[in-house]
């Protein structure tokens, strides 16, 4: 049984910053398995890289380890950052489903705000509109989508994504 925390850091040419990440939580009764999420808003490149610092305490003894981690660019855009009308920088991420079906899919979305370069708390109490579009078919949408909302403060947002046929869909989150 350990107490665990982590801090991802992007080392850029002129600055360093973190990204949205959850607490690390114990998920096994014997204390040998922990989980959490990290939402990387940008990929590494030839001169800029991510590392992950993990702090943990076992039987009152503190330990720290830091390792460079691989964060390659994604083929699909799943993260967006934007400046809100309130002057706050927001980050929105498509989390799930990883393999959507022609059906009404359970959907998970994350919404965070940039408090400062190292802190990105979850935004509470918003509604995320789910608007799937099929560009090759006249940009039509689909019925039965359910906007994503939080079940409890501090958590990710859950909704329903309806896909009516196979093919390329663009999922707009508003």
Predicted regions and their residues:
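Beta-strand-rich structural segments
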Residues: 1, 101-118
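Acidic/polar, low-complexity intrinsically disordered N-terminal segments immediately downstream
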Residues: 1-13
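Hydrophobic beta-strand positions in extracellular immunoglobulin-like domains
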Residues: 8, 38-40, 56, 111-113, ...
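Short beta-strand and strand-turn-strand segments in soluble, beta-rich domains
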Residues: 13-21, 138-144
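Aromatic sugar-binding surface patches on proteins
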Residues: 24-40, 48, 150-160, 167
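Extracellular Ig-like/FN3 beta-sandwich strand-entry sites
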Residues: 45-51, 102-104, 125, 154, ...
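Surface-exposed beta-loop interaction hotspot
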Residues: 45-107
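Short, exposed beta-strand-loop hairpins at the edges of beta-sheets
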Residues: 54-61, 162-165, 171-174
């Amino acid at each position: 049984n350990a107490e665990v925390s982590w801090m991802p850091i992007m080392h850029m040419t002129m600055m360093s910053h973190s990204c949205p990440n959850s607490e690390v939580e114990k998920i096994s009764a014997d204390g040998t398995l922990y989980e959490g999420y990290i939402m990387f808003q940008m990929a590494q490149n030839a001169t800029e890289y991510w590392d992950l610092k993990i702090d943990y305490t076992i039987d009152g003894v503190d330990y720290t380890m830091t390792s460079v981690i691989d964060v390659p660019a994604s083929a699909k855009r799943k993260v967006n950052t934007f400046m809100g009308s309130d002057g706050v920088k927001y980050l929105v991420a498509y989390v799930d489903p990883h393999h959507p079906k022609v059906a009404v899919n359970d959907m998970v979305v994350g919404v965070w705000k940039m408090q400062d370069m190292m802190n990105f708390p979850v935004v509470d109490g918003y509604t995320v509109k789910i608007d799937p579009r099929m560009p090759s078919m006249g940009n039509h949408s689909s019925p039965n989508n359910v906007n994503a909302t939080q079940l409890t403060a501090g958590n990710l947002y859950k909704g329903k994504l309806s896909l009516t046929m196979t093919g390329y869909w663009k999922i707009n989150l508003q």
